[in-house]
Amino acid sequence: MHTHNNFKTPSDEDELDDLDEDMVVGVIAEIEQEVLNESDSDNDEYDLVDMGAPVPDNDGDISYEGNDSSSSDDSFDPNAADSDSDDSMLDEAGGVTAGGATSAKKRKDDDNPSGSNKQPEATFDLDEDDETDETVRAMIAAIKKPRSSPPEIKLEDFITDICFHPDRDIIALATIIGDVHLYEYDNEANKLLRTIEVHSKACRDVEFTEDGRFLLTCSKDKCVMVTDMETEKLKKLYETAHDDAINTLHVLNENLFASGDDAGTVKLWDLRTKNAIFELKELEDQITQLTTNEQSKLLLATSADGYLTTFNISARKMYVQSEPYEEELNCMGVYRGDSKLVVGTSKGRLYTYNWGQFGYHCDMYPGIKSPISLMIPITDRIACVAGEDGNIRACHIAPYRNLGVVGQHNMPIESLDVNASGELIASSSHNNDVRFWNVKYFEDFGDIKYNEKHNAYKEQRHNLPSSKCSNASDFFSDLTKENADGDDDPGAGPSNMA
């Protein structure tokens, strides 16, 4: 406390001038001691104990050790760390204000006397006003709305290919480390059934036989593996099936399948034999896809060197090869009652061929601006294509129309497949995820006429029901509907009275 040497009042100014300086200092010290005693006496015994202060004697006086409070100030060290006794004193002090030092752990233990760390659960209660709010009702409806497709599957390893089982709700996921994961999918949850270690290097393609009994895989290790789905054991191993890394497989029926490698070689296999039925090398670059129609008389192959090559299976020789294209032919599909073949390219184009006339295309559609690397037929006239832009788009075949976006990924799409019923699409991306899209609504799509007017720009950006994005027009249509409802309300708007 800072004190003045001359302590005066206006009434006795002259008398204080004659006082001795030591006497004034003594009087001030006595006043300070009396103030301190009065403030301490206001605290009861229990408060003093909790605060760590000395306990008063029976007569109410407090005993102190040492000379006075100034002596304790001499031993105070501002740089010294707080002692354990100080911490315990702060933790035990209860009922403190915002400036107090109540321990967080102490408060937590007081809230949970049993010692449990479980926090009280938050509840979301709606009153009558909230339940009538349009936004709240829309949120509740979205939460209660049942899922129309299985949830996403996420793996640690890069997914190279996917394939649906023909009879069961099972999907196979091939990975870059050579394993195949079998998942049972459902709208509520997905279940990992088993993981099969099949190859020593990246598994590039996975296929089920038509009856679903066997699982076929090919790899960069040049092998083809056949696994029994019932016993989960290796049925057959075609070791060094190709001289180069195998890129793609195609199942013709329950016994026959074809394979293509990175050097342009195509082979046909029979599960009942040890060696290939025949081998043809008419290309110099990677075989990107193999396919046939229902009759399975011709085997078609697209390649990275820009050729569409057709093989006669029964004659075991090449049937016809197309004119070269200055772009990679990546994928294809058969449509319109096996009368049309459509090929997707690295420039985003779609070429159409009449069946049996594979030398040159009869029609070309610009498609999308990004490369098309995947294509699957959904119906006889609707195809889904995907590629590097991460979008799955639906196209109407002959005539060509962009129907809209089926689904999307944040990264390029690596594989695409449709289940046996044609109602569910699965896609995987470079983000190691598999997403499912319910496309049952395509059953209600009518046929498109050649002379129908359409807006190509709008169609390319239109989001279909399975898409995770909504259209801006849907928002404005809701506003228009609300305005129309308001116009019908006799109590809305200005009065019509004359």
Curated annotation (Swiss-Prot):
Residues 12-23, 31-48 have a biased composition (Acidic residues). The keyword Cytoplasm does not apply. Disulfide bonds: none annotated. It comes from the Eukaryota. WD repeats lie at residues 154-193, 198-237, 241-279, 282-321, 324-363, 408-447. Residues 67-82, 93-103 have a biased composition (Low complexity). Residues 1-131, 478-498 are annotated as: Disordered. Pfam families: WDR55. GO terms for biological process: defense response to Gram-negative bacterium. The keyword Protease does not apply. SUPFAM superfamilies: WD40 repeat-like. PROSITE patterns: WD_REPEATS_1, WD_REPEATS_2, WD_REPEATS_REGION. Keywords: Repeat, WD repeat. SMART domains: WD40. Belongs to the WD repeat WDR55 family. PANTHER family: WD REPEAT-CONTAINING PROTEIN 55. This is WD repeat-containing protein 55 homolog. It comes from Drosophila melanogaster.
